[in-house]
């Protein structure tokens, strides 16, 4: 028998985490005892081999070595033969496949080979095979119990005691994995434990049969338990161990058969007690969150990673799983619960007691329901743990009948189950009351509930951890709350419960008795009852029932007593928003009534503005059948289903339902915004005098984003027809309702298209008015958004006389080959046709399909819908002339418009035309053509009868923001309409700046020149005259509906100009021209057909390879070349006629997208007239003219070249003064031109005494602003508040002035009015670059090393000059002059001879390419008395050299007061200065040659100044400076014959007194900057600074 001294209840922690390697070291201490002992040792190592646990910190290699050693110890190849080894392996497999009920008994017998195993099995069959079948199971079970109990007590003892070595090696190493094996075998089973106790199985089955002799069988089972235990004790006494290790191994073998059982028992005991020291190693890890009640056995397998083993062999067989599935679920569950209490942790002297009394307690549970544990727990630790469990249960338990707790102190901690109306449920609940070991659903729950004291009353589930039980109760609480009108969406806990549900239908509906196997299904089912209950209790006050559940009280603690979610319709409150969502579905039917009320309000012109409460309510429900087909009335839950359904009506004949009243299709979206936009935010105004109907403000755009809907407004004097072409998206398959009229009396025909998508941002509102006296045909080109492959349906308006109307349909491909639409209208007296062309701004990704609808005189119609899905299908427009003679053709107006479309489509759409002013006046805004596209539509001839209207919709695709004719914001001055108030505000600045003279004959012609950024785009239709060429011959009345025919016809009128007509005025093309005809025209003009060249570069005919420029006749092979070429002609000059005296050219900014008109301008070369879209292009172009000898234009009195910066900045001063804007700034009084506004400001001071108002008007008449229109307009209204005191430039805010003042920070003098700034064609050097100046010669160098080498040359020269005393004296004077401060040098420069200031004054003008020269020196002949003729020529060479410098000053905002390094030495007021020293060097500031200093000292003595312009002489520099103000901007020099070279002989500039002495000295000049040097070596080294 096992020694009791090792028995201890406080030591099990070690057994749960065996130290395998310590065990190995212990085994190696006595190798003679272990190795070679025979089968005992072999079996021991076998178990260790099978149950070795991989320990990560040990490492894989050591683990492998360990496994190999254990295998060798087990098989012992040194002592065993191959046959014996094979026998061992076969025996292992045999033990695996034997029946489960025999395995414990066989393992207890420990067969050493296969023969012994077979003998045992045969003996078992003979011994336990019953004679009668009725008692076979009982007898077998008794025997199995007996055999099991032979090993159970020793196992119980040694599971908690034993010496230290045995505990580590034997039990911990081998049995502990078996502890977990029973749980890891199968997630569904506790099967091995059930089979270990066959009497328990018999008892369970007997209990299910409700046999009367249950008590007797229980007592028999108890006696068998005692007998089994005695057998085990005798067996242990018979086998005397040789030593301690052998004894431990023997005990291990005996306990091996009960390893699984004891392991589970111990685990269950731990979970039941809840405070076991082995909790960290428990086989039942707690899952407190998520209610994941995956069998704990499976969890332990995943967490521990143990090799699953079948008690002794660790191989999981399929047969075992099948046996588990076949086993009795109730017996398994109950058995496990019995076992969980059969072997609790207790002392050795109580072992026999617990083994006997446990069975007794289990039996008495069936008889005495109140004594579940009677004598089962005699030990304080267990009872304390159990009492704690019962306390928890009591704390959370409430009797649903209101009788209080039904828990007895000694009874099972189960509360009375919740009655659901099911007898089966009651029976299960009663069984759960009887015993802790019997779950409610004994047949369907294969989980061991005995060790789980927390039992759910709803479903009978048991839980071992309180947190899991609470989570589970939360789920039931949510389900139960449905009964009280509150619905919940089951949380993650419920979803986890669904995963853990095992077994049959265990969730039963309390209302109808239906059962479900998942709680989620039951929750969904209860929603049905909850909705019905809510309907019944809708108008009643239902008390909130208190659910006596701990989880509900927890919810109350979280949310409080008040519920937060209130139904705004019926004021019912809910705890969760999901409950409110479910509740609000009841009110869904009320919405339809509201919708009809909204329609009535709209008919009355009232405004419906839903409250925020309704908005929130509409957000809540979106899943009922909200999508109704207006054709057949069928409703759908999803919009996609409706789309699929509407295919049927689209493919069918939409005219079948022509007798029905056409209603608006209401297809709400799934969100609040989509839903709201369908029926609110519409404020319609109906005017009974026949005017258009409008939708106010943002309500129009919001409403029409979803769909385009037309409301019919009937006037007194007019009959109106709404023709609508709705945009659709790619997936739009909704039907289109086109209902012709049944009778002649009904003259209102309209087509309604519905579009449920929010991204349809293009509202279109068309009202076609038909009247006896007047007919208006308003046709809108609709644009859709992004990817649109849609239908576009046009329904003909039916006049009294039944007419045939043809609306051509074609399926356009990606580039929309055909963008042509035509409209002709004929009236009895006057016909007007207005076409709004709206160009889209996004790339076309869709097709344009127009349905071909033909209506005969009987009202019959047929429709041909192009296949929208076939991108390659090309259907040309067909000819379908209208039959019948034409009547009342006295006056006709026909405007046929073709709209082109480009790929990028980044242009802004044209604004709507002005309103009708007088009879015969019409406005035709031309479309913005970005790329040439060839039309593929054939010619269409349309003839009309009287009172007939034919409508052709032309659909360019893309996003547009200007709405045609439905625009609310109309300019009161010119009648132009805008979609947004901001656009109107920007537009009205034009009128604020300048008002017309008041005459009705003055009209504005606004030419917008678009500067594209995409090189693929082009400026087609440059001249508005060619777009409006007369394409209809009066004799034949021929109409052209497509641009292809129009282009053909335009060749005839290629040279005509539409502005030649005096009545129409003249408009030049800027891509978008709004022309409003003058008043007083008494006759109706002939039709104007504006056509745009529509050429698709990818769809060109193979023969069309030459693209001709319409302006100059040049031909190009590639369309892109023509596009680039036409940019030259894109900017047109204004033509002032008698009717149009004010013209404004402004630009649109593509990047700003029409919010403002600030953008890149077109830059025109004044030399040749060529225009460029970017200043860099003009910069490159003007380099050609820089090499010309003359800078002035031949045909102009004032010649100039506008040198523009690479990145032009807005000139603030130019913005303030309109006269300063543009590429050339000129004085409007005297015509004098300036490069920068600072010079002009100084010049304008001379004209202050003049009338400023008159000058401003003159400036505005001749202005060609280069800045954006909005910036220009803003400049007219803002006051010039901050003015620079140095240069006179004005700024809007002090910040700009502060930035500007920094330019003049270190300038000693104020600039005079004669100062003009020097501009470079390239940017100056960024930042301050240090210069190293040679004090000997005044030269500057970038690097100090170059200066050092340069000084060495001076040393050598000084050594050479020491021979001559005269040379040494001259060198000393040079040294003295070099150190003279820069300010002194400037003062000295003020006394320079008269020719030098003239040269310096002319130098900036040459470099800035000022063409306005009045008295240019042809050869630089402003010669002084001492031979200074070459000096101006030397200076004239500077522009060529300095042209390579960066754009320094031109980049400044206004260029005022900014000077280059050499200009720092200039006299601001026109005083003369040395050109070589400072002006010639771009790097040096105030640096001069030694000789120059000497000259200046001499010049100070006898100064006098000669003016080369008027040959006047001055002795005072101030007087001479004032005189030069009149010539400041008029001096220019001819360039050299060669680029960068001087054309004259270079000699030193000198004064009249000292010039003759040094006139013969020879110098070497730098070709780049013009600096002079004494020797070639110095020149070569200097030139290295330019080359880098």
Swiss-Prot record:
Give the SMART domains listed for this entry: SCAN, ZnF_C2H2
Listed GO CC annotations: cytoplasm; nucleus
Q: Look up keyword Transcription and say if it applies.
A: no
Q: Where in the cell is it found?
A: Nucleus; Cytoplasm
The segment(s) forming the SCAN box domain are 46-128
InterPro entries attached to this UniProt entry: Krueppel_C2H2_ZnFinger, SCAN_dom, SCAN_sf, Znf_C2H2_sf, Znf_C2H2_type
Q: In which ranges do the sequence repeats occur? A: 1397-1403, 1404-1410, 1411-1417, 1418-1422, 1425-1429, 1432-1436, 1439-1443
> What residue spans carry the region label 3 X 7 AA repeat of P-E-V-E-A-A-E?
1397-1417
**Acidic residues bias: where?**
129-142, 1395-1415, 1449-1466, 1475-1495
GO terms under biological process? apoptotic process; regulation of transcription by RNA polymerase II
* One Pfam family of this chain: zf-C2H2_6
Q: Which residues form a coiled coil?
A: none
Gene3D superfamilies membership: Classic Zinc Finger, DNA breaking-rejoining enzymes
Question: In the record, what terms sit under GO molecular function?
Answer: DNA-binding transcription factor activity, RNA polymerase II-specific; RNA polymerase II cis-regulatory region sequence-specific DNA binding; zinc ion binding
UniProt domain comment: The SCAN domain enables PEG3 homo- or heterodimerization to control gene expression in a combinatorial fashion.
Its annotated function is as follows: Induces apoptosis in cooperation with SIAH1A. Acts as a mediator between p53/TP53 and BAX in a neuronal death pathway that is activated by DNA damage. Acts synergistically with TRAF2 and inhibits TNF induced apoptosis through activation of NF-kappa-B.
Fetch the PANTHER family from UniProt.
IP01015P-RELATED
Q: What is this protein called?
A: Paternally-expressed gene 3 protein
Q: Which organism is it from?
A: Pan troglodytes
